[in-house]
């Protein structure tokens, strides 16, 4: 899908990380530029074959500009939720639009908020339990703040860490896109273009710049 949207143009990845998406996309002949705040993640990208063909700028993808225009910009695997305020998420859409050529597309892959799975009267949703780790998510419906809670077990010891997110609804993303001068072109449940329904637990959405 991303290669098709890029066509003969260039692709911009917000949160390029270790290159899980960028490397195969670059391998298909699409020029890719990435933005990421983590130098450690980019170092892991640079250790992989083919990474020399990918340009990377260190910075916050919600605000960092690069001196190029692109046919497609994309942000995958729930990374929009790493921006923990609505203002930052709105800024991300504006930044994507500024980098896109007219007719270019911004693609986001994100989960649908799981609030309906919460037990009545509770704010914590168990997500994964195994002998090696526990994962749970807590939600604040008033602020859309969300925290991931992770426990990793090594022998008799457990290490706990937490990570903040902001969950966001598909319709809210559509409004952010409109504020940035883009309109919804397509929305699917997954990269295979499965139709998006009320039962879908994630979405891949494409907005087009006017």
Describe the residue ranges of each PLM region.
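Conserved alpha-helix/loop element of class I SAM-dependent methyltransferases that forms part
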Residues: 1-8
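Conserved class I S-adenosyl-L-methionine
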Residues: 8-15
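Class I SAM-dependent methyltransferase SAM/SAH-binding core
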Residues: 18-63
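A short acidic, Gly/Pro-enriched loop at the edge of an enzyme's catalytic core
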Residues: 62-72
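A short SAM/SAH-binding and catalytic strip from SAM-dependent methyltransferases
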Residues: 71-87
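A short glycine-rich, Lys/Arg-flanked "PGG" loop and its adjoining helix->strand segment in the class I
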Residues: 90-102
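SAM-dependent methyltransferase
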Residues: 107-178
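C-terminal lobe and adjacent flexible extensions of AdoMet/dcAdoMet transferase-like proteins
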Residues: 170-210
């Amino acid at each position: 899908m991303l290669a098709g949207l890029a066509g003969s143009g260039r692709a911009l990845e917000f949160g390029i990380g270790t290159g899980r998406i960028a490397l195969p996309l670059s391998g298909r002949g699409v020029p890719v530029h990435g933005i990421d705040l983590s130098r450690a993640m980019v170092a892991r990208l640079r250790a992989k074959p083919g990474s020399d063909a990918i340009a990377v700028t260190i910075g916050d993808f919600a605000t960092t500009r690069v001196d190029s225009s692109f046919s497609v910009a994309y942000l995958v695997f729930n990374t929009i939720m790493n921006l923990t305020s609505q203002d930052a998420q709105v800024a991300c859409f504006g930044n994507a639009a500024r980098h896109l050529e007219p007719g270019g597309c911004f693609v986001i892959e994100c989960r649908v908020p799981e609030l309906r799975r919460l037990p009545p009267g509770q704010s914590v949703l168990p997500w994964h339990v195994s002998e090696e780790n526990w994962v749970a998510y807590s939600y604040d419906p008033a602020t859309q703040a969300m925290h991931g809670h992770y426990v990793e077990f090594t022998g008799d010891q457990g290490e706990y860490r937490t990570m903040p997110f902001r969950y966001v609804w598909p319709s809210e993303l559509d409004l952010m896109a409109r504020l940035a001068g883009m309109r919804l072109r397509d929305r699917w449940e997954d990269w295979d273009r499965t139709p998006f329904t009320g039962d879908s637990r994630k979405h891949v959405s494409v907005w087009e710049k006017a």
